[in-house]
Amino acid sequence: MKRAFLDNHYDSILTANREKILAGGNGDAFLEKALTDSRMALVVLIRIPSDAAEKINRCIDDLKGIEPNLYYYPAEDFQITVMDVLKGEEGRRIPPNINEYIRCIEECSKDISPFKVKFDGLTASDNAIMVRGYYDDQLMVFRQNLRDMLKQRGLSLEERYKTISSHITIARLHSKFQNPEKLLDFIEKSRLFGTMTVSKMEISFHNWYDTKKEVLSILEL
């Protein structure tokens, strides 16, 4: 995916939410029960390696000095959402035809080779802070192939929106930002978190915050 396209995407998120952030943002009421959240989803995702995670954690340490009361994701929950196959719904259970989904996803993964994702900079919405990710075309190919194959096989796809980014959500807002101007200054500074080679992806049944998860399959590329 071209860098300019993703730059525009991440920039537009921040621009659209700037005034909301300055006004304190819009808190996520569900965060009070993040550990027991039962809005479960079937997803394909990418876990983040330790070297990039360490750099992100150092950034989080700095963020805590500005906004100490945010919900900060632990390193083991850092992820790139490749595809929300079945969206997060309260009390959702693993579907009885899960093996059909797994076979479909596994077949699509065989059509791509390992690819790179570069983590460069931050962006933010009115209730979340994200690391910007820039990916090779292989990820775009996989996403479209999976959409097509699920449709061909009559399997439901509940993508909340057409996924085009490769961001990592690292923090979420409980109630109100305490220092929104300082936060925006921090987010807009240049920072590089490194590049990872994606050689495997994960099929997971997890909740909104990834605090409850069941790994259903590991896809080796």
What are these regions (language model features)?
Residues 1-221:
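Histidine-dependent nucleotide/RNA phosphoesterase domain, centered on the 2H-phosphoesterase fold
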